[in-house]
Each structure stands twice: as structure tokens, then as C-alpha cells.
């Protein structure tokens, strides 16, 4: 059964269909949220809340985007709310960086490079970080990112360009020293 059929059934109240939708998108949602927050504990809390909100609000899903994009939008909005309410949210610690899941079978060198990038990403404002992650880790188009974040394509492109420039400066600059 395809995603559209599952969505129709879930919106009709079929719990099994909703469970399948969440299972099919869990890994991507968890990975995105971990990259966004760089905190395993915060990620677990956010993903749990996103799944709950998705179940409660499934009838509000219009189908204008993929279900995964909708889940990511919920995660982003919830994270924004957390940042607004709690200015003291802890970002990644070294121990969490080195324990990031290695789900792509990367060798240790690539894993360290990814962790270095994630470390630098977490120093940036969340709008820039999220735009970059959606584009370069998940392959979303500028148009899709703009819809998810509720901003113009120009703003999305600018955020990604800024992030790339900043990462190049930080990562290449640290290799030279």
C-alpha cells in the first residue's frame, strides 16, 4: 500500500495505517531532528512529541507535501517553540557527537568529518542550520524548503549560501592552522 492510500486510511481513523506511516518516516525524522538539535535527549523528546501531534492532527494534513515533510515541519515548529520558551536549551556535548549513529556504514574518517560539520552547524542560528540540513542531508529543493520553513526561496538560498560560506571558512580555516 502506497503513502497516499495509507494517508487516506489514517485520516479515516485507521490506527494501523497511521502506525505504518510513522514507522516508514521515523528514521528520517529522527535523523533530521538529531542533526537539528545535536542532542540525543532533546531529539527523543521532540520526535515523541511530533509523532503524538501527527496522530492528533492527521485530519489536518492536506496532502500538499510528502508526509515526511509535514513531520519535519512539525518538528521545526516544536523546536522553535522550545527555543523561544527555554533560552537555556543545551546543545551538543563532545560525548554525544562521538556517539552519533553510524547508519550509513561510513568509515571513521568520514564520520569524524560529519561530526565536525555538525559541530560547526550547531553554532549557527537554527534557520540557517535547518535550511542546510534539509538541502544537503535530505535533498529537498529550495522550493520545498521554503514551504516547510514558510519563507521565500531567496531567503532559503541566502541562508544556505551563508551556511556553506561559514562552514568553509571554519573547517578549511581550522585545517590550515
Question: Whereabouts are the PLM-identified features?
Answer:
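N-terminal module of bacterial RNA polymerase sigma factors
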Residues: 1-28, 122, 144, 148, ...
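Sigma70-family region 2
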Residues: 11-12, 51-66, 86
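Short, charged helix-capping/linker segments at alpha-helix termini
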Residues: 11-20, 30-49, 153, 175-177
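Structural recognition of an alpha-helix C-terminal capping motif at a helix-to-coil junction
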Residues: 31, 45-52, 65-77
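Arg/Lys-rich amphipathic alpha helix in sigma70-family domain 2
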Residues: 59-62, 73-93, 162
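Internal acidic/polar
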Residues: 89-114, 141
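DNA-recognition helix of helix-turn-helix
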Residues: 128, 143, 147-173
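A short pre-motif secondary-structure segment
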Residues: 131-135
Amino acid at each position: 500500500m502506497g503513502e497516499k492510500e495509507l494517508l487516506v486510511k489514517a485520516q479515516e481513523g485507521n490506527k494501523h495505517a497511521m502506525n505504518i506511516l510513522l514507522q516508514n518516516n521515523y528514521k528520517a525524522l529522527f535523523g533530521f531532528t538529531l542533526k537539528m538539535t545535536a542532542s540525543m535527549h532533546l531529539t527523543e523528546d521532540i520526535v515523541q512529541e511530533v509523532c503524538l501531534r501527527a496522530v492528533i492532527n492527521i485530519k489536518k494534513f492536506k496532502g500538499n507535501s510528502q508526509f515526511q515533510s509535514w513531520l519535519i515541519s512539525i518538528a521545526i515548529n516544536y523546536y522553535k517553540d522550545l527555543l523561544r520558551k527555554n533560552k537555556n536549551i543545551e546543545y551538543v556535548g563532545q560525548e554525544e557527537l562521538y556517539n552519533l549513529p553510524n547508519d550509513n556504514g561510513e568509515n571513521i574518517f568520514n564520520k569524524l568529518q560529519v561530526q565536525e560539520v555538525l559541530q560547526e552547524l550547531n553554532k549557527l542560528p537554527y534557520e540557517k542550520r535547518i535550511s542546510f540540513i534539509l538541502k544537503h542531508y535530505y535533498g529537498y529543493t529550495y522550493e520545498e524548503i521554503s514551504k516547510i520553513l514558510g519563507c521565500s526561496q531567496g531567503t532559503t538560498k541566502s541562508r544556505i549560501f551563508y551556511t556553506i560560506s561559514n562552514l568553509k571558512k571554519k573547517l578549511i580555516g581550522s585545517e590550515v592552522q
